[in-house]
């Protein structure tokens, strides 16, 4: 018998709204912004150097969108970022983020 895992709408909405900079705290061993980065297209873009147990990444973040410059793949939101950086399924990414959020509180600004 297959057990179906589901999440309530409030949890998914909250995690999807989580700032990516906060998500990086939960997903990485080390993450820091590149203060020398000068965005070309959007002045709000930031480049992050991220280290996880799976390797090192160079991630551009603009609002809720992210782009991995080395893998040349992008996405949107913290759940998608968790799936990419940690190689997780959707269910595992949501579980990981929600567990870490619970340790640090749900409100991030």
PLM features per residue range, with description:
Residues 1-109:
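N-terminal structured subdomain of primase-like DNA metabolism proteins
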